[in-house]
């Protein structure tokens, strides 16, 4: 009697658990026959958990999770290139009739048919991962193997577009959940042509993990949309003539303040000062230049515990000063503009503009400091600021 689909799936699960010596069902499994230049059969599967020591000596350690058979005779599992480094968690067997039983392992490593097998294994593996149900993918696969996908985007140029579709991020749309780049693009506002990384009512993707910023730097665009890191200068959400004219008018109105900040208040600590187009609630922000390190990247580089020395590139990026952006809609900024027009040497304004090193006592947050300055300068309540932020967002939506 013909087996049911469920019975076949149960047999595959039993095989995978026996093969990997694990008690949990695999996250995904695929059984296929490849034909063409070389014919072979294969069963591949994704384990439930990251194999122990997966990232020990990453890239230099051979993977023994793929076992090669020739006409049902075991040949070897001593491979370095059966699967790319980022897919070294995939387990399974390959049985080919197109290889010789007498071939040595050394010769096999250079065999041209092995390269064909590898290419097809990668294609089938990515196809298998893409078909994992969203809930299982987000809750199980991404938590265990998300780092592998990000490393793949960095290292595997030929499959980068496919791997980008498998990336997941936290975003401002639903902070408790994770989202794909495809979902982010679908939710884009009209006229938005860039994916925001880090807001004026725009969904922002959070780069919270060390590897993920390298990953995005290796990915020029997704679905025709380039990435825009809002922790860097030059963020624009709308390039329409109406928006340009509006911003130019604001820049002209506030011109004395950025000039005063750059030339007098904190001239030795910043590269330049400018009027922001994206701040809505914060009164100001320090952002990196287009080719500089973001604050997150700086923390990553400073945390390199085994760094043996700094190269020319590292020293160059580490020494670059930040750009100081001000929010022209914030009551405190408006009051600063009024005060410096009256007296450029106003002690209160000078004190407010000083950029200090990070506090040794983190209990006093930036928000606490801002509230203290509000009281000192007798500027806007929280309700007034919120109303200003709402008006700012409404203005952008209209544009």
Curated annotation (Swiss-Prot):
Family membership: Belongs to the heat shock protein 90 family.
A GO BP annotation: protein folding
Keyword Endoplasmic reticulum: no
Disulfide bonds, paired cysteine numbers: none
Listed Acidic residues bias regions: 354-367
Its job: Putative molecular chaperone.
InterPro entries xref list: HSP90_C (IPR037196), Hsp90_fam (IPR001404), Ribosomal_Su5_D2-typ_SF (IPR020568)
Gene name in the database record: HSP90B2P
Biased composition (Basic and acidic residues): 368-399
Classification lineage: Eukaryota, Metazoa, Chordata, Craniata, Vertebrata
Region entry Disordered, spans: 350-399
Superkingdom: Eukaryota
Source organism of the structure: Homo sapiens (Human)
A Pfam family the protein falls into: HSP90
Protein name, entry field: Putative endoplasmin-like protein
Keyword terms, alphabetized: Chaperone, Isopeptide bond, Stress response, Ubl conjugation
Residue location of crosslink Glycyl lysine isopeptide (Lys-Gly) (interchain with G-Cter in SUMO2): 130
MF terms (GO), sorted A to Z: ATP binding; ATP hydrolysis activity; ATP-dependent protein folding chaperone; protein kinase binding; unfolded protein binding
One GO CC term on file: mitochondrial inner membrane
């Amino acid at each position: 009697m013909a087996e049911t689909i469920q019975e076949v799936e149960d047999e595959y699960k039993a095989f995978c658990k026996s093969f990997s010596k694990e008690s949990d069902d695999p996250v995904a499994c695929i059984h296929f026959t490849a034909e063409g230049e070389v014919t072979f059969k294969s069963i591949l599967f994704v384990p439930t958990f990251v194999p122990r020591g997966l990232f020990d000596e990453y890239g230099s350690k051979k993977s023994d999770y793929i076992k090669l058979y020739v006409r049902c005779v075991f040949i070897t599992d001593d491979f370095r290139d059966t699967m790319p480094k980022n897919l070294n968690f995939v387990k399974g067997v390959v049985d080919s009739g197109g290889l010789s039983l007498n071939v040595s392992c050394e010769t096999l490593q250079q065999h041209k048919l092995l390269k064909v097998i590898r290419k097809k294994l990668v294609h089938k593996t990515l196809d298998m991962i893409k078909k994992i149900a969203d809930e299982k993918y987000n809750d199980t696969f991404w938590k265990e193997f998300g780092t592998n996908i990000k490393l793949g985007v960095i290292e595997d140029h030929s499959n980068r577009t496919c791997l980008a579709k498998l990336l997941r991020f936290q975003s401002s749309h639903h902070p408790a959940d994770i989202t794909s780049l495809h979902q982010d693009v679908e939710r884009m506002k009209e006229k938005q042509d860039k994916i925001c990384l880090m807001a004026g009512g725009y969904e922002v993707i959070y780069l919270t993990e060390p590897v993920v910023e390298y990953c995005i730097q290796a990915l020029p665009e997704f679905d025709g949309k380039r990435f825009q890191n809002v922790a860097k200068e030059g963020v624009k959400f709308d390039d329409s003539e109406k928006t340009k004219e509006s911003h130019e008018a604001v820049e002209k109105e506030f011109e004395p303040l950025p000039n005063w900040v750059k030339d007098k208040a904190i001239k030795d600590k910043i590269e330049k000062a400018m009027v922001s187009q994206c701040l809505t609630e914060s009164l100001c922000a320090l952002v990196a230049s287009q080719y500089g390190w973001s604050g997150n990247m700086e923390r990553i580089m400073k945390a390199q515990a085994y760094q043996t020395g700094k190269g020319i590139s590292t020293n160059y990026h580490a020494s670059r000063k930040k750009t100081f952006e001000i929010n022209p809609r914030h009551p405190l900024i408006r009051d600063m503009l009024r005060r410096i027009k009256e007296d450029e040497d106003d002690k209160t304004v000078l004190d407010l503009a000083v950029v200090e090193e990070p506090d040794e006592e983190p209990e006093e947050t930036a928000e606490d400091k801002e509230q203290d300055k509000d009281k000192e300068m007798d500027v806007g309540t929280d309700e007034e600021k919120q109303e200003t932020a709402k008006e700012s967002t409404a203005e952008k939506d209209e544009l």
